[in-house]
Amino acid sequence: MALHDKFGRQITDLRISVTDRCNFRCVYCRSADPENYRDHDEILSWPELYRLAGVFKTLGIRKMRVTGGEPLVRPGVEEFISHLRDLDVEDISMTTNGHLLSERCARLVSAGLQRINISLDSLDAVKFERITRTKSFASVMNGIDVVQASALAPGKVNAVLVRGINDNEVEDFAAFARERALIMRFIEFMPLDADHHWNRNLVVPAAEVYNRIHARWPLEEIPHHYSETARKYRFVDGTPGEIGLIAPVTQPFCGHCSRIRLTADGKIRTCLFSKEDHDLRSLLREGASDEDLVTYITSVVMEKEAGHRINEPDFHPPSRSMVFIGG
C-alpha cells in the first residue's frame, strides 16, 4: 500500500514530534515569553505512537524522523527508536538541538538511530546565546564531537540564517564543515517564528550562500533524489565535508514533497504551513481500528496542499510556531 495525494506525489517520509517541550528558546522558533505547553494527557503516549508508527509503515512510509520540541527531553525516546527499528523502518533519523546529545549518543546508536541533524546557528558563543537564549554552546559543540566519533558520523549540522544576526558566518560554517568532515546545511529563514517578526528582508537566499562559499572554496554538486529538500555540494579540492542548501522561500520544492508531519498532540499536518490540523488522536482514543486509521490518513493525505504559498500575496503564516509543529 502507498500514500499518494491528488497531485500524484507519493508520501514516504514522516516527521514524528514526540514532545512540544524544548530547553531552548530560539528566536526564529519560540516566543521569549512563557508558553502554554500541552497537558501531558494531550500528548500522544508512547503506546499510541508505537501503534501509529506501525500504521504509517503499512501505508508505505519508509523514512521516519523523530523531532520535537526537543526530542531528547522526553524520557523513553531511545525505546521508541528501538520500536521503529523493530518495525523495519528503512531510515530512522532525529533532529536535536544537541544539548543532551553527548550523554545520549551511544544509547541512540544502540537503539537503532541511523542519522542525526543538530541545530547550530552560530559558531560564536555570545551570538549563540542571543539566538537560543541559553548558555549551551559548549554542550552542543561537545555533542557534535561525540557524534563525529560515533556510527552516526558524518553528522548533519543545520543553521538557519537570519540577515543581520548570523549571515556573516557563512564562510565560518563552511570552514567548520571542512575541519570536522561533517555535513553543513544552510536553511532559509521561514515564517514560523512565534513572535511573527519574519519578513523577506531577513531571508538569506541560498544562491547567495552558494556564491560566497564557492568563491572561497569551489564546489561541485552531488546528485540527489528529486524529493530531497537539500541541494548538496562537495568541495572540489577533495577536502572532506559537504554543504547542503535548503531554500523553501527562494527555490520552493513543494512539487516533489514527500513529507507529512505528526504533531506531539496527535494532529496530522500535510505541510509545515497548513492552516488546518487533522485530528488523529481523537480517532485513536475513540477506539478506531487500524483500518479506520488507514482510511482517515489516506483521505487526509489525498488533500495535501499543492504548496506552501509563501510567495503568494495572500500568504499568512500558520498559527502554530515551529516548536508546536515539529521539525
Provide a role label for each language-model segment.
Residues M1-D13, E179, F189-L192, H196-G327:
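Auxiliary Fe-S-binding modules of radical SAM enzymes
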Residues R25, C29, V126, I131, ...:
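Residues that scaffold the ATP/ADP-binding catalytic core of kinase and kinase-like folds
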Residues I43-V66, E70-I187:
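Radical SAM/AdoMet-radical enzyme domain recognition
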Residues V18, M184, G266:
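Residue-level signature of catalytic and energy-coupling elements of molecular machines
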Residues P34-D39, D124-I131, D193-H197, D279-L280:
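A short acidic, helix-capping loop that chelates divalent metal ions and anchors anionic groups
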Residues F24, A125-V126, P252, H278:
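Glycine-centered loop/turn positions within well-structured domains
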